[in-house]
């Protein structure tokens, strides 16, 4: 493999990592801040992809982004209503919505399982036209993905410091304290899940426009990928402020995609990639714990040696 091919693989991994990092940031909000494990991520990601694809095929690539985010917001709203108004466990609520979204996504696609955007204008082609004749013309995909990730990081950094953002963080830490402060945790949970759903759908929309196709399985395994990326980011940068943790989520997504790309280049069978994802998740979860246990193991070994 020559050097240009290596750089091409790295750039593709960066682009895909930045696009998927938007989903990781959504999981950061719902899982890390709200302490809610939303298993509707896969279906919501596909919802954003197919909604954005259908809207872009109608000739509105920019409107496709907002349509996808609106669809994701509705998905998050339904998940939160099932949890807060109907007393359904968060895990079960996510599974129910994820199951329902499969039928909804097929309906949006008009009964098809694949939508092609080969002859459709996308936000990436718009960026390419905007940068035509500039030194950055060849990096239009990377710049578009970077802009999306940067905007979401900036939004979360500012939003989580507002009154509502602080209430969302408090809800995840101690719901009883939030109730005693005359704040309805159902409202904060709903707001948080709606925002997370819109981010997940945005990520799906961007990926569909990036690869110029949307299929019914585009979001399969996305919750696993996002969780692994989130844990990798927290391992790399550790625990810090909101901005640092959000940046860590983005870095984790890029690292995961790089590892995934290497696995593909090693001619690994496609059916083994899910196993690779599972192994990465296990390592991302266990490494922080093993770090804390390492001094204990060393002390035990020293005692045995003595």
Stretches with model-predicted labels:
Residues 200, 204-275:
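Transmembrane alpha-helical segments in multi-pass inner-membrane proteins
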Residues 60-99, 104, 252, 256:
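Alpha-helical transmembrane segments within multi-pass membrane transporters and channels
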Residues 173-180, 184-187, 259-306:
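Cytosolic-side transmembrane-helix boundaries in multi-pass membrane proteins
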Residues 29, 54, 77, 81-86, ...:
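Membrane-interface helix caps of multi-pass small-molecule transporters
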Residues 75, 138-218, 223:
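Helix-loop-helix "hairpin" substructures at the membrane interface of multi-pass membrane proteins
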Residues 16, 90-92, 141-146, 218-225, ...:
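Loop-to-transmembrane alpha-helix initiation sites
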Residues 7-61, 81-87, 231-243:
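Single transmembrane alpha-helix segments in multi-pass membrane proteins
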